[in-house]
Each structure stands twice: as structure tokens, then as C-alpha cells.
Swiss-Prot record:
Enzyme Commission numbers on file: 4.1.3.39
An annotated GO BP: catabolic process
Binding-site residues, substrate: 16-17, 170, 199, 290
The entry's keywords: Aromatic hydrocarbons catabolism, Lyase, Manganese, Metal-binding
Residue span(s) of domain Pyruvate carboxyltransferase: 8-260
Protein name: 4-hydroxy-2-oxovalerate aldolase 3
Family: Belongs to the 4-hydroxy-2-oxovalerate aldolase family.
Positions marked as site (Transition state stabilizer): 16
Keyword set includes Transferase: no
Amino acid sequence: MNLKGKRITVHDMTLRDGMHPKRHQMTLDQMRAVATGLDAAGVPLIEVTHGDGLGGSSVNYGFPAHTDAEYLGAVIPLLKRAKVSALLLPGIGTVDHLKEAHALGVHTIRVATHCTEADVSEQHIAMARKLDMDTVGFLMMSHMNSPEGLVKQAKLMESYGANCIYITDSAGYMLPDDVKARLGAVRDALQPQTELGFHGHHNLAMGVANSIAAIEAGANRIDGAAAGLGAGAGNTPLEVFVAVCERMGIETGVDVWKIQDVAEDLVVPMMDFPIRLDRDALTLGYAGVYGSFLLFAKRAGDKYGIPARDILVELGRRGMVGGQEDMIEDTALTLAKARAAQAKREAA
């Protein structure tokens, strides 16, 4: 595998996916410090929103410390080189949220749907293109669709106007061969000028390996987070990925030492708990469960006396996807009732 001289765009998730383990409670000062550090390190694209995207503030997804507008307004004026992106999930974020983000100076909008539901993105992608934004179609939980199925969904998003398509391993479930099969098929099907991206999670410790596999399959945009701060066991750790790229001769434009300093000096100290591959995060990857379900499952487990791991396995068995957070407590309650009934039978 010789990728020497290949140039890619690194996209940082610390201030968006990292909102999940922070329970959306990042301060404006934390946002400013990390964003300016990333900018100084040469990261060209930084995502800033509620963990569930524009408009995510709700009972279902969690109330943030500040509004999206406050976060974006705090960060964008400080950046010298980097551009800011925002995530938008149709059904959570609206066209009005999109217009507001554009007015605040957001450069890139990533319209995210489940990997079989690209058709719900048409209105938002079309509006973003009308506003002349860098417009990304973001196919979540991509392990749940075949390469052929992803091709159909990617081509829909491309037809709506997306100039980049992302294959997203939201559960950290995929292995390098899975990544190559899916991204290779999509790359072959898209127009040559349409870019291809990959978003990985580290729930099987495959974030870096999968990202390299994605580049090999034709991806030129890769997501990561400083110190891996993100849902589950975190995103692909950006400082590690940049170092591997440096070793391989892949050109990121990111300073290998400065990105380490951002991770170690700014991001690690603001973690509420270590982002690591514990048994629950590992279960996300093994069972193919949406990464941001982790803290919801832990809370439900504490409430009903059911191990979070058992809840996550059941969510995977049921094929739950992003947007069904309200079903996690229902699943925990169902398991608790079933176990209580079984214990009663055994005692009889």
C-alpha cells in the first residue's frame, strides 16, 4: 500500500462529536481554546454544534450549556485559516437552522441521515447548495447497508447537489475490509469531482486502520477528534492518525507536534471521564450499536439495575438506530421486567 504523496483533508470532530461524552456542556472558553489550537495546528475544517447537530437541544438529546449560535459565534471570528462545519440531521435540524448557520459564517454543512434514508435529505442539501455552501451527504450507521445499497443512497445525495459523500461508521463496527468494500463501491459510482469521506469510531480500536483503508479506497476527507473525544470509545484519535499519515507520506497539512499538544494540553483535561475502550464501548462496536447510545444506556442501566452492556446488546439485536434514544429506557425496562419475572418463576 503506497499512499505517499496522497493529499487529504482532515476534519476535526472534537467540538461536535465530543459534545456527547461532555453531555453537551462544553463552555465557550473550552470551545475557543480548542478551536484556536486546532487552527494553529493546521486543521482545515472544524465541526461545531450540539452533538446531535443543529437544533439538537431537546429533552430527547440533551440540553447544551449554550445555543448553537452562541458556540458558532464564539469560535468562527477567532479562526485564521480553518473553516467551520455544522452537522444537520433532517427531523432534528431545519432549513431555518441551516440558514442561521450560514449567516453566522458556517462554511460546510453535513446533512446526515440513516444509511437507508437519503431521500429525507433532499430539501436540506438543495438549500445548502443554493447558499453555495460546501455540502456533504453523511450516511450514518453504514455497516447496516450493503455496498450496493450505499451506492444507491450516495447517488441520491449526489443528485440533490451534495459535492461530498461520507460513509460513516457510527457504531465503530466496521473492519478495514468492510470499509474498503463500501467506499470502493461508492467511489466507483460517484462523479469524479464528487469527494468521498470517512467518519470512524474507535469502539474496536480500528479508527486509524479504517481511516487508512478509506484513503486507499479513494476517500480524501477523513474525520477524527483530538484525544479521540467523541461518542463511545471516541472518534479516530486525530493526533495518532496524523502521525501515521506522516509516517506513510500522506499529506494532511497538520503539524504532528501541535496536534498532540492540543490533545494532551487542552482536550484531555476537559474530559469528564477517560475516553477509552471499556467493556460498554467495546460492546457498541461488537454489536453494531450507535455510539451516542452509550451514556443513555448507562443511565438506564443504573435506573433499572440492568448492566449497560446487556442493554446495548439488546439494542443491537433490535437494530435500533440514531434517533431512537427514547427507546433505550423502554428497552431497559422491558429487560428488567423479564428478569424479574424469570427470577419469580425460578423462586416458585
